Structures are given as C-alpha cells and as structure tokens.
From Swiss-Prot:
The gene is MYG1. It comes from Bos taurus. Residues 1-47 form a transit peptide. Belongs to the MYG1 family. Keywords: Acetylation, Hydrolase, Mitochondrion, Nuclease, Nucleus, Phosphoprotein, Transit peptide. This is MYG1 exonuclease.
Amino acid sequence: MGHRFLRGFLRVLLPPLPLRSPHLKLSLEPVAPSKRPRSHLMAPPRIGTHNGTFHCDEALACALLRLLPEYREAEIVRTRDPEKLAACDIVVDVGGEYDPQRHRYDHHQRSFTETMSSLSPGKPWQTKLSSAGLIYLHFGHKLLAQLLGTSEEDGMVGTLYDKMYENFVEEVDAVDNGISQWEEGEPRYLLTTTLSARVARLNPTWNQPNQDTEAGFKRAMDLVREEFLQRLDFYQNSWLPARTLVEEALAKRFQVDPSGEIIELEKGGCPWKEHLYQLELGLSPAGTIAFVIYTDQAGQWRVQCVPKEPHSFQSRLPLLEPWRGLRDEALDQISGIPGCIFVHASGFIGGHRTREGALSMARATLAQRPAPTPAPNPMVQ
C-alpha cells in the first residue's frame, strides 16, 4: 500500500475527532438514547444484524462500520429478537425500518425503494440500496477521509467515494436485491467468483453437522474489509494519479503527431482509458484519440488502440489487418517498418523496439483508414 494510504490507516488506529460530511443530502441527527441500562452506557457500542445465513451486504456494512473509530470495538449482535435489536446502537439489514436519525438501516421492507440517486440528488446510480449501500451512503465520506488521512472537503474524497461505489459497493447492492446484470437477453457467461458469491460460500453447507454461522460471518467481514481496502488503495495510488499523466499526454498530443490522434504516456501500465474518455469531452479543438504509445516493463514500445468503450474488445481504429497475428521479421516485411515485435490477432495492440517505430505503426494505420467518421465517446449518452 502507498505511504499516504498507510498514514490514513494509522489515523484510523489513532482516531482523530470525527468530522461531519458536507456531501450528504441527508444529515445524520444525534442517535436516540440507547435502551441499554444506564450501567451499560460505557460499554462498547453494539451493531445489530440478523443471525442465520449471512450475505455480502451486511458483512460489508458491519466491516465498514468497524473501520470507523466510534465502532472499531463494537460488538456484533446477530439476532432477529426485536428487544435485543432495540438495545443496539446501530442496526443493519434487519428490523424492517430505515431511519438514519436512529441509525436503523434495513432495506427489506416493502416501502423501501431508495437508491443512491434518490437519497443523494445528483448521483447517477439507480440501483436499489442494500444495507451495504446505506452504510456507505451515510458514512462513506467520513470513512474515506479517515482512511486517506485527509479531510472530507478534499476533492479526492468525493472522487474516490463515487469510484468506490460504482466499482465495489453497487455490485453488492444489486446482487443482494436480485437485480439482473442484463436488462434483456441471456448473459453470455456466469459470474461465480463475485465478492457476494465468495461470502455466500462461507456459510455452512446444508449437510454440515455444525450449522453455526458466527465464525463464518467473522471471516466474511475480514474478506470484504480487505477487498474494500485493497480497492481503495488502488484507486488512490494508481487510478487517480494516472489522470495527471493522461492530462499531460493530451496537452502534448500535437507535439507527438500533427494529427492530434496519438498520445504518448510518460509511464506504461497506468489505468488510462476511463480518464481519456472523460478528458476528451473537454478537448479544444474537439477530437478523439486513436492510439496510445508507451513503454512496457522491458523498455520496449507499445502502440495500443483506444477501444470504443472502456471494457470493449473493439477498437476505434485497429492496427492494419495484414499485420495482425504476425511477429518479428514477418511483420517487418509486410509493414515496411523494421524493428516490429508483434501485432495482436485482433489488431488492438502492437509492439516495437523503438518509439519512432511505434509511432510509424500508428501513423501508417491512420494513413490507410477509410474516410474519417468521428468516433463516439462512451461518456456521452
């Protein structure tokens, strides 16, 4: 993990004063007095959730809460007994009520239809929230600020808050609420190794003599907490810094090639695609990028085609068809560019020993393309 992230995590271990989030539309009022006896008021707080078979959403909800200083030592009370739940400081995924003022975060009641968009106007996500999404919505900015070692007002917190929801929490919400990955048609493959599926497999099997779920639930919290922290670390220390590299590359694109359709990244291997699509929207003059060149770990050059969409295997402009699937001397001969290493069979990427050679591969493809038609930007709906 990066040093900044570790410093942030140390702040969780040595908690600062809690901060209120200015980002949330629903403010959290002080919690109603606990129904616990007065003699227990100094006891660790209690997080209530249901017992029996557990799922990814409440495991993640509890794990996220325990990353906050005020709940780090919290007791997890797994029960469906209303009296025991009433004595808890916060209740997730059980109880049949959503009342953030009293810290009740269930989503199973018929009346509950909330999404990130409905509770936080301006957010685009329309997936019905699970207990994980509810906890993330109400505590996420505060949690990320503490983990990242900064304030909630830091723009990085807002950026990573959105990124972590879209790429981590929303899937948990969707799976728990039974929302199909596809709106129409048959899925082309099965998702069997998702976070939710791995949590589900920690439950006892139907034919195990011991049906106790307590140990499995603790393992589930460890699993989702570790994965959440790893993802946040990646977005903070890899994904976010890559934006600066893409911005710089776009600013220099006409120095790389007069077409303005080839950019050169200072460092290869960075996650550039999503940043490119977003930054293209503000280009002046307007345009889209066809190729990205960069060095690989061996110091050789790659020329990669920009895909039509972030996760698409189709390129805006693939490398020339006669080159595809060829290597070394055979590729040199047919391309007329000495020093080639390879071109992938689909044409989405190629390799060359030199920067000039990689540029020549991109330029030759640009020169032989059909009459230009502006490539759509996937960020434009």
